[in-house]
């Protein structure tokens, strides 16, 4: 796997190309899911960046009054802050320098599921929702590296006093953490 800084670099270049609708090559691969594919080149690397259902996510960002330029600025202008890696799921998290957004790696299965519910999700989500706000699904493919990402709102973007953090999964199986743990689980809740 590539170093975090390299992954972040390719993610930023792909985001800039797809969000600004530029790139060496763009085509809609699937008319139902609307996958925009960009063949990009950076130094000696040739790689693909996929943006899933661009127009639907544009509508979601517009619903939450997210200006495209400020979105790109948050994600691309400065280095992201590397977060935690969750060993069980293998997910890696970053947050933007301004704390507005979280970037999370997702599995192929999670990507497929999110894409399958995207139409219903976008029709259901409202301005005052308690659902996580997903603003984009992306994929980087580079020789032997393949990773998928979602970008979502950071619910902790403002300084607040948090007494407990829970990792809730909606099940009780293996879902108890020692009270001294940093993250508590479903049974602790």
Give the label of every model feature segment.
Residues 1-189:
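Polybasic, positively charged surfaces/segments
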């Amino acid at each position: 796997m590539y170093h975090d800084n390299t992954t972040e670099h390719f993610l930023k270049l792909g985001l800039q190309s797809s969000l600004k609708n530029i790139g060496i090559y763009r085509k809609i691969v699937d008319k139902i899911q609307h996958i925009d594919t960009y063949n990009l080149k950076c130094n000696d690397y040739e790689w693909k960046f996929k943006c899933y259902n661009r127009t639907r996510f544009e509508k979601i960002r517009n619903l939450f009054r997210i200006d495209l330029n400020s979105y790109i600025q948050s994600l691309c202008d400065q280095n992201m802050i590397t977060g935690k890696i969750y060993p069980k799921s293998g997910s890696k998290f970053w947050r933007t320098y301004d704390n507005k957004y979280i970037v999370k790696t997702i599995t192929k299965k999670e990507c497929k599921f999110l894409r399958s519910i995207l139409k219903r999700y976008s029709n259901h989500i409202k301005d005052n929702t308690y659902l996580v706000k997903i603003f984009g699904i992306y994929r980087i493919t580079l020789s032997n590296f393949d990773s998928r990402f979602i970008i979502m709102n950071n619910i902790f973007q403002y300084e607040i006093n948090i007494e407990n953090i829970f990792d809730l999964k909606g099940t009780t199986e293996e879902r108890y953490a020692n009270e001294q743990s940093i993250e508590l689980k479903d049974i602790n809740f």
